[in-house]
Amino acid sequence: MFVGIAAVALAVPRALSAQVPDDTPGLFERLNLDKLRLTAFGAAFGPVAPTNTEPTVAYSLHADYGEIARNWRVVFTATYWGTRYTRETVARLEDKLRESIVDTTVSARFELGRIQISDIAVGGDLRWTPSARVARPYLGGGLLAHVVNAEGKAIQGTFIENALDNIALGFAAVSGVDVSLARHLGIGLQARYDLTSGVRYGTLRATGTYYFDTAPGRGAR
């Protein structure tokens, strides 16, 4: 699972920063996309409680492609979490199904059982980092593509499964702090809120990062 997510997190920015034809001069230079290069790579995890689901843990990977402008960094991310809908949510869904069907025998029963749900979100953040010290707070936002998948024995292959599955763009707000522990290693704490069609959630994540060059604030030795 994470091998595939990591490949996507690395492939997307490489595609964006690929060389463009000579007949479009100045575009990448004006946007500073030609400056992007992989400077750090890391992982994060933390508790998450998406709407109408049981709390779970989110796992993510991040690839830092450096500054696109002064104090503004581009960070590509890929996040996964999996859980199930709460019993109350499933009960409400059963009630709506019951109300939508005319049952002349008054004997129809709806028992959907456990419905699993997962989300894979891939996209990029633009983060404002005002300093390059050992401890570096940041604030920013992102645009991500979410792939939400629902599974359950009772809904497999039905219109219910199709209705719960979703592929949509979403937005994220992010803030946190990164701390350089050693020349190439850093840790951090991040608060994040993701919003997309049908799913929204906040999470607090612990992060770990490997810097290919010297970590900010450490200096060359």
Question: Which residue stretches match the model-derived regions?
Answer:
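Residues that define the transmembrane beta-barrel architecture of outer-membrane proteins
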Residues: 37-39, 53-59, 116-122, 135, ...
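Bacterial N-terminal signal peptides
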Residues: 2-14
